Amino acid sequence: MDQLVFKETIWNDAFWQNPWDQGGLAVIILFITAVLLLILFAIVFGLLTSTENTQCEAGEEE
């Protein structure tokens, strides 16, 4: 059991010492963050434009 834990620790340490793995992880995190921010902006501006359109239509009918 101790050997299995020891091998897993070695692999984990080797991963963090490889700059290509760190860079790849950073790119994946940035991509996911950008997609989430775009979705957030789409929701926020979609709600803002929908309320403005309903107010304009109500004003035109009067």
From Swiss-Prot:
Topology of this chain in the membrane? Single-pass membrane protein
Q: How does it assemble?
A: Homooligomer. Can also form heterooligomers with other sarcoplasmic/endoplasmic reticulum calcium ATPase (SERCA) regulators ARLN, PLN, SLN and STRIT1/DWORF. Monomer. Interacts as a monomer with ATP2A2/SERCA2; the interaction results in inhibition of ATP2A2 Ca(2+) affinity.
* Keywords carried by this UniProt record: Endoplasmic reticulum, Membrane, Transmembrane, Transmembrane helix
Say where the protein is mainly found.
Answer: endoplasmic reticulum
Could you read off the lineage of the organism from its UniProt record?
Eukaryota, Metazoa, Chordata, Craniata, Vertebrata
Please report the organism this UniProt entry assigns to the protein: Homo sapiens (Human)
Tell me, in a sentence or two, what this protein's role is. Answer: Inhibits the activity of the calcium ATPases ATP2A2/SERCA2 and ATP2A3/SERCA3 by decreasing their apparent affinity for Ca(2+).
Would you indicate the residue range of the signal peptide?
none
Question: Where in or outside the cell?
Answer: Endoplasmic reticulum membrane
Going by the entry's taxonomy, the superkingdom of the source organism is recorded as: Eukaryota
State any GO CC term: endoplasmic reticulum membrane
What gene does this protein come from?
A: ERLN
Segments passing through the bilayer: 25-45
Protein name per UniProt: Endoregulin
Is NAD among this UniProt entry's keywords?
no
